[in-house]
Curated annotation (Swiss-Prot):
Family annotation (Gene3D superfamilies): Alpha-1-antitrypsin, domain 1, Antithrombin, subunit I, domain 2
Protein name per the record: Uncharacterized serpin-like protein MM_2675
UniProt keyword Repeat present: no
Classification lineage: Archaea, Methanobacteriati, Methanobacteriota, Stenosarchaea group, Methanomicrobia
Origin: domain of life: Archaea
UniProt source species: Methanosarcina mazei (strain ATCC BAA-159 / DSM 3647 / Goe1 / Go1 / JCM 11833 / OCM 88) (Methanosarcina frisia)
Keywords: Protease inhibitor, Serine protease inhibitor
Region forming the signal peptide: none
Sample GO molecular function, one term: serine-type endopeptidase inhibitor activity
Pfam families per the UniProt record, alphabetical: Serpin
InterPro entries linked to this entry: Serpin_CS (IPR023795), Serpin_dom (IPR023796), Serpin_fam (IPR000215), Serpin_sf (IPR036186), Serpin_sf_1 (IPR042178), Serpin_sf_2 (IPR042185)
Swiss-Prot/TrEMBL site (Reactive bond) positions: 381-382
Recorded family membership: Belongs to the serpin family.
One GO location term (cellular component): extracellular space
Amino acid sequence: MSRIKIILLACMLALLFSGCVENSAVFEKNTATLKENTINADSVRGYDIASANNAFAFDMYSQLTQQVTGDYENILFSPYSISAAMAICYEGAENTTKEQISNVFYFPTNKTVLKVRLERINDRINSGSGDYELQTANALWIQEGYPVKEEYLFNVKKYYDGEVANLDFVRKPDDSRNTINEWVETRTSDKIKDLVPKSMITPDTRIIITNAIYFNGKWAYTFDKQLTEKRAFYPANGEEASVDMMYMYNNFNYGENSKAKIIELPYKGNDLSMYIVLPKDNNIKEFETEFTINDYTELKNEMDSTVNVDILIPKFKFETKTELSDSFVEMGVVDAFRQANFSGISNSPLKVSEVIHQTFIDVKEEGTEAAAATGVGMTVGMDFSWDSKQREFKADHPFMFFIEDRRTNCILFMGKVEYPEYKNDT
């Protein structure tokens, strides 16, 4: 007898998530009255969710680089979005299934510690200023009539602020797919479309978990469009390309060591920043293989805010869609896809069948839109000259980038630019 399937979706993009789409499915309000979990406050404080999220980010990045087959394949993902969706899955996992998810995502064995910390950090992320848009959203889509435990639903609603809806995957798969895709589009300002393909929903589908994170922010110091011009960019294979390169001269947090340079580009409001890590040698594949979370932390600790920096970085815009099941299995989450134990969700057998992660990013002069960025002095086309108090950050070859929430120290987005193609919307 085949096991009933649970589908996990993680989508990360950019922009404000608005109201629910109109459909026969009705979202339940957070009115559950089950007794809340209690736990020692010291146990909650002892778990550093940012460190766990960031460690997973580097593990996930390593897996994604192994999937790259072409010379110019950019990478973008949201470790926070993936972790948040898997945390909802973890809430119902038991025994070996729970242990494997815990090991890969650095989750504490005590589920209450995790959900209390996630609830607090989600509240902080979703309570930003009016200087930018940053919001997360969770939803649990359940087959009509499928028995899900009341305690699980209560925890999803309370601690994960999850919306819950019943759909008919069996008799109305197209309607169900359209409802979920419209939910995603609404919460990503139409940047992510058709997340759920027709082939995903089958008669065995019982639950779909979705998470979305959206960010739209302006730079604290915007790049002057008049200083953007075509300049040379050198992909890893050495073939020169002409790309739109933005220029700015200003005071920024900047650091370097023998292998790389790093710069922090803050967004308006100073709650979030983009960090760009530029290898000194044009060999991104060798660099990323050796670059660890500890290296990243140490490089950030080298940053100095007292120097002026001449910056050249390319505009870039791209989107990705990745199926992560094989990556998760390689990382150690095996039973969830095979001999799963999700008895905390339902007494009926469940297993994860697919994990889809779809992303979008747009980095230009004004800032960054991600789903999931004061030029002074030099005239366009002039050669640059440097003095001892200046630093140069010339991103004319492949680099890594991170978008972090400075309030929580969480890496929300992580990626790599191999080739900075930029196409304006038509």
